[in-house]
Amino acid sequence: MKSHLQSYPCPLQINSFWNLGFLLGITIILQIITGIFLGLHYTSDLNSAYSSLFFFIREIFYGWCLRYLHSSGASFVFLFLFLHLGRAISYGSYFYNPNTWFSGILLFFFLMATAFMGYVLPFGQMSFWGATVITNLLSSFPSLIEWVSGGHYVYNPTLKRFFIFHFLFPFLLCGFRILHLFYLHFLSSNNPLRNSTNNKIPFFPFIFQKDFFGFILIPAICFNFL
């Protein structure tokens, strides 16, 4: 444990772009925590889904804060995700460490699926449109679309399925993230100069300081948007 958390060797040349993975992990954890509390009061029914969210905002102590942390946090997840992905493409991480790259791509697809299903859950006018678009993407597979939507059109079974998938997928994401970290620590990190040097520094305290600064910066920015 010490070799992976404290004395883990990191390239000397890495910059702040290498902290985006940590920030992405923190925002995903924040999404899971706030999503659990939202799920406790959410009703997956066409007639009461929208009102259950407003009940959570108005009647639950600090419910408005949890709800907007969840919705604003999703924006930060995708901000850090695309910056993290762009950094990997820009510095050739996909060539240096392909196993880490492919495990990250799996994370990306699961995260996109989770976000699409979460977009449907409030079930206003735009949510109905989103559910219709998502299910129509599977129209080439009749048996699959009927299983996903629970019928021949978007209705209560569709919303229940999307809620269950949206609730379960983040925990599957945690499993893929462990796999992603395993490959990262097994094959080490890339660096901006793309050179294989043995001149490395321990993760703690040098890299930890940058990660901790980002950890403090996220809540400050997020609460500013609230």
Where do the protein language model's features map onto the residues?
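Membrane-embedded and interfacial regions of multi-pass energy-transducing membrane proteins
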Residues: 1-226
